[in-house]
Regions:
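N-terminal accessory targeting/assembly segments
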Residues: 1-86
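Residue-level signature of catalytic and energy-coupling elements of molecular machines
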Residues: 36, 90, 159
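Short, ordered loop/turn segments at secondary-structure junctions
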Residues: 41, 133-135, 160-163, 185-188, ...
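P-loop NTP-binding catalytic core
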Residues: 56, 68-128, 168
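Well-ordered alpha-helical segments embedded in enzymatic catalytic cores
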Residues: 89, 117, 141, 188-195, ...
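P-loop NTPase nucleotide-binding module
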Residues: 107, 118-163
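P-loop NTPase switch/communication element
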Residues: 149-198
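Conserved P-loop NTPase nucleotide-binding/switch module
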Residues: 201-202, 206-220
Length: 220
């Protein structure tokens, strides 16, 4: 049986404007919550497993977005930010002047027992590539695979956007004994991959996202 552990949803609610946080709490559906969408000039919405609903009838203002940004800190080069020691992710949409005009606040969850479907592949010792559309659980499976493999092997996680190990300098407990290397510039992730091999003697490397030719070459 799967055991779902949700990173304290209150940590995410606390960075949102009060009226939006209150609407989420009142809806009492946080177990099903996937994302909160905040776009300038539009009403805020919540995306659940069965669809999208409006949270309030008030349109999002610059002040609303500024409030959230101030509470989460700076965005990385890929316009993503997080909440320390959680798996939640906030992605920004910016205008041509670099000002935030939209936010996608994704709920991060650690789910134990998700690797059963590929357990034989994980234990084979061969390289594995997971493909699929966004939001179907690729990172969740990678996180759990890293935890399981780290019980017996030296595992390094190259964490493209801090989604496997969470935001902050201390990795989330869901990765177990696996060590985590953060990627300061996504365009240079291949260098972090090579550094992991050369400096830290891993038996297994887990990479969250591979989307560039240099990264594919480094993975070989």
């Amino acid at each position: 049986m799967q055991k779902r552990i949700t990173d304290n949803i209150n940590d995410l609610i606390k960075v949102l404007p009060p009226t939006i946080g209150a609407a989420l709490t009142q809806a009492n559906r946080t177990d099903e919550l996937l994302e909160v969408i905040l776009d300038l000039g539009r009403v805020p919405t919540a995306r659940y497993l069965d669809g999208e609903v409006t949270l309030t009838n008030s349109e999002i203002t610059h002040d609303d977005l500024k409030l959230v940004v101030e509470r989460i800190g700076d965005f990385d080069a890929d316009n993503r930010a997080g909440i320390e020691r959680t798996l939640h992710r906030i992605s920004g949409i910016k205008n041509r002047r670099g000002h935030v005009v939209g936010l996608t606040c994704r709920v991060g969850r650690a789910v134990y027992g998700t690797t059963d479907i590929i357990k034989d592949l994980i234990e084979s010792g061969k390289s594995i590539l997971l493909l699929g559309k966004p939001g179907i659980g690729k990172t969740t499976i990678l996180r759990e695979a890293a935890r399981i493999l780290a019980e017996k092997k030296r595992v390094i996680v190259v964490d493209t956007s801090n989604e496997i190990g969470g935001d902050g300098d201390v990795a989330h407990p869901a990765v177990g004994r696996a060590r985590r290397m953060q990627v300061a510039q996504p365009s240079l992730q291949h260098e972090v991959m090579i550094e992991a091999v050369e400096n830290h003697n891993p038996e297994v490397i887990v990479i969250d996202e591979i989307g560039r030719e240099l990264e594919a070459a480094a993975a070989r």
